[in-house]
Amino acid sequence: MNRIAEKTAPSAGAELRARADIVSHTLTKTVSNLLDRAIAAARDALVARQTAAGYWLFELEADCTIPAEYIMMMHFLDEIDAPLESKIAAYLRSHQAEHGGWPLYRGGDFNMSCSVKAYYALKLAGDDPQAPHMARARAAILEGGGAARSNVFTRIALALFGELPWRGVPYIPVEIMLLPRWFFFHLDKVSYWSRTVMVPLFILCTRKPIAKNPRNVHIRELFTRPPEVERDYFRDSLLQGGLLGRILLAVDRLSRLIDPLIPKAMRARATRAAELWVLDRLNGEDGLGAIFPAMVNALEAMAILGYPSDDPRRVTAKRALQKLLVIGPSSAYCQPCVSPVWDTALATLAMQESGCTASLAAATRALDWLQTEQLLDEPGDWQLNRPGLAGGGWAFQFGNSYYPDLDDTAVVAWAMHQSANSADYSESVRRALDWLVGMQSANGGFAAFDADNTSYYLNKIPFADHGALLDPPTSDVTARVVTVLARIGRPQDRHALSRALEYLHAQQEPDGSWFGRWGTNYIYGTWSVLMAFAQAGVGPQDAAVRRAVDWLLSRQNSDGGWGEGNDSYAKDRRSERKCASTPYQTAWAVLALLASGEAGSDALRRGVNYLMRTQQADGLWSDPHFNAPGFPRVFYLKYHGYSRYFPLWALAAFRTLSRTRTSH
């Protein structure tokens, strides 16, 4: 029996009156008891999910491209796990939308690339093309223009299966590995995720292998014209790239003509450079870059280079992929990566705010584990732009030593600093802050993994139709760094803090909100910045804060909550971003209002009321929505932990501030 059920519940009338008290600004004893019970139930449920090692880890779900690619990988290599394939196929079928295709997030519009991969995966798994669900999918794909309209990554996957000619994908020869740093394109100029995905892809796209495809499955029926006849594979690059895009596409076509002239010795040297780059970063059972697309490309590249299936490195690379699987009784899917450091740091902040002995003990166990995960003197790609900077960051995953990120590092240092045992973590915090400040970009902002990764023209190359080749500074990451720098308040960080605040002020949208690069969307970005402003001493009456608060108030729903969909990332659909309330977005809004002098507002208490009303009997909250972009407009995520720890954090923070106000 869960602990909330052991207590005597108030009558329905008493609870309704108590909630009315919340809305009318009075934290009565009855309301206080209800709030305490809600917080205790959420806290106990979260503590119960902490691992023995001290970390929290919740599922991280992506759209159907990832599980579809897992099936395609098995057929590329002819290493098919039939029971697993059957379960992944069941997952894909269950996520087909009413429009016949597959969206990038639940409830989203038809997406061509996701639909093509899901259809192909199901056909590879043995689904009859004439089955009703396959016929519906095929009709939706053809209505959208056919598989030729897929994005670059999907077209490369199809080329590897011989489904379209290689002229239908960008020219990315392995000789890119030999280019000097001053050249207009170099690996150092793109993001970590682009590097780790592209380097093994250079090998694949240069060797141009054909998948083993043991069942000889093809999808010519998804093309409106025969793929060998199709001449319009780069239509989107021409439409969206402008003059620069057309020039770069012309360079791409010219380069193909030169390819036969490349000396064999140069090709061999470049291939070996790419191979060694991958092997140096293979990262054990955590995988290249600790992200699925890079890991798949690495495994397939190793196979093409002649590594036998029992080679220890290839076995380890395959095991890294298998560890991403979430396998249930009747279905299975593959995660894009895992998020233990992020989940643990945020859950720890919620535990600290909830403030009881059990919470603080759980937080200490979590911080002790986090301390062991800090990356200090390990090599990392970030050092290419900051060669003299000492390490001190944390990665997002269990193991990803080449790629610590600033967001995780800021949140971990924040939690460590506000611990009752902060002295135990002082050296870890010092190293973290030194590293964060050293990673500030020239414009004053902070990016996720790199500094000054701002060669924006590269987003116009034919390969970059996803628009996410780079890792520039963002408001949400900058806000997190500002929060921890201001909270700790070291004198030597004042200049960096001042520059970061200037950056945040400059990034405010005309309507008062901030864009959320790593969480959906303007509610997330606005919460992040308002928390940072509060820590940095930007007062509630500041004009930027007032505009942000006014925007938040205008987005509150009639049920007291807040909600925003991933369609808010579409440039022409921003007016649609207000949607059904969610627990995590309501929690962000509540935390933002608490940080902005709105502790006595009706809006705040209505938000708290929404969170209490939607809490489940097990103490947690449930929500089906995807809550973050991997890449806006291209790839979205559902952090299953967000509805577990963010509402707890918000309720506990509301209680703390309410009691502080009452005591005064």
What residues fall within each predicted segment?
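Preference for long, amphipathic alpha-helical scaffolds in soluble/luminal domains
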Residues: M1-H664
